[in-house]
Design a protein with these regions (language model features):
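Conserved beta-strand/short-helix segments
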Residues: 1-149
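Extracellular/surface recognition and adhesion modules
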Residues: 44, 102, 155, 159, ...
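Short, solvent-exposed loop/edge segments of extracellular or virion-exposed proteins
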Residues: 152-172
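Structural beta-strand segments of beta-rich domains
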Residues: 177-181
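Short proline/glycine-enriched turn/loop motifs at strand-loop junctions of beta-rich domains
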Residues: 185-191
Length: 192
């Protein structure tokens, strides 16, 4: 779960929810109206059984954009994983997907294990904890600048563990230019 900067919006993942299949997962967002937490829009369900959608979630400072990880999604190979980005429309009380799915690079990457939106929501960091880029299961974090649809989204930076330890975006994005990335036995702060 994660709360926005003002503390009046919250996104919660339930990765073993069975709404669209066993363990498909889902996420819900809530807004505090001064006396109670009220759901914003409908549940956002995972694509298929076993996706574990909602295993990690993030919300921008305004509470108008969320990122949801589904580390076991099979869109680009078995357990490649993916992340979906949604914007909230108060006019229709609904969430709509902003871009196409951001899929893991290869089978068993488990992309979406951790996700972190920047304060503005214009940048997202996505951890693929078992990506084999520099070593078997070394993991990496890809950072994407989100562009207005229908522009293509591509990574602007990839942070990898050179020693074989797993790279995890721990969600500690402090502003739009700094991200803390934790490796199994190390920690690094990167400016971009």
């Amino acid at each position: 779960l994660q709360m926005n900067a003002a503390g009046d919006r919250l996104v919660v993942g339930a990765h073993q929810n069975d709404g669209s299949g066993t363990d498909a997962g889902h996420a819900r967002a809530y807004s505090y109206n001064g006396s109670a937490w009220v759901q914003l829009g409908a549940d956002i369900d995972g694509e298929a059984a076993g996706d574990n959608f909602g295993n990690n979630v993030s919300i921008n400072d305004a509470g108008s954009r969320i990122a949801i990880g589904g580390q076991y999604n099979n869109g680009n190979g078995s357990e490649a994983g993916h992340v979906r980005i949604y914007d909230y429309s108060p006019d229709t009380d609904s969430w709509s997907q902003v871009q196409s799915d951001i899929d893991g690079e290869a089978a068993e990457d488990r992309s979406g294990f951790a996700v972190s939106l920047s304060a503005s929501g214009d940048r997202v960091a996505i951890s693929a904890i078992l990506n084999d880029g520099t070593a078997n299961n070394a993991g990496h974090v890809r950072i994407f600048d989100l562009k207005p649809a229908p522009d293509t989204v591509g990574p602007t930076m990839t942070i990898t563990a050179t020693d074989g330890s797993n790279a995890v975006a721990d969600g500690a994005t402090t502003n739009d230019n700094t991200l803390t990335v934790t490796f199994t036995s190390n920690e690094a702060t990167t400016n971009f």
